[in-house]
Amino acid sequence: MLDLGCHPGAWLQVACQSLGPRSKGGLVLGIDIQETSKPGRYTDDRVKILHGDAREVDGTVWKSYAARGLDVVLSDMCHWTHGNSVIDSAKSLDLARTAFEISLYEEEGYRLLKPGGSLVMKILQGAGIEEFARELKTYYKTVKHHRPKATRSESKEVFLIGLNKL
């Protein structure tokens, strides 16, 4: 699993636990522009963290960590909000598009996100999201929105999910 925008580490913990026992192997690779320490609780040596901007990562880095590709790309990336819903949703959409582009990375037979894999992106509701969801449908068998029950009623946060990459 690749966790884009992994700071402060909650999804790293959830993802590591989802791998099951250490004997089953697996990898959770997190990246964030903020310095992030591996959470000590609920994680183990299968969690690796890179400090940097995911948009600037060279494909050889993805291949060196995930030589066989990944089953899930998760984006919890979020910009500093301005309080202007139009600007905030546009920036959020830009980050979701970045996650989508990273999930499509291919080179010489290598695919970062394996066929059948999933893409999960946090996004702020606003203009352009439905068009983006339609675009995702050309790459994923199923595309859906999810708003967790625990989300505050005033929050514009939703998850856009692509399942079963074609």
PLM region spans:
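Class I S-adenosyl-L-methionine
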Residues: 123-166
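Conserved beta-strand signature within the Rossmann-like core of class I S-adenosyl-L-methionine
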Residues: 111-123
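Conserved class I S-adenosyl-L-methionine
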Residues: 1-7
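A generic alpha-to-beta junction signature in SAM-dependent methyltransferases
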Residues: 19-23, 66, 106-113
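S-adenosyl-L-methionine
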Residues: 31-81
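Conserved SAM-binding loop of SAM-dependent methyltransferases across substrates and taxa
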Residues: 8-23
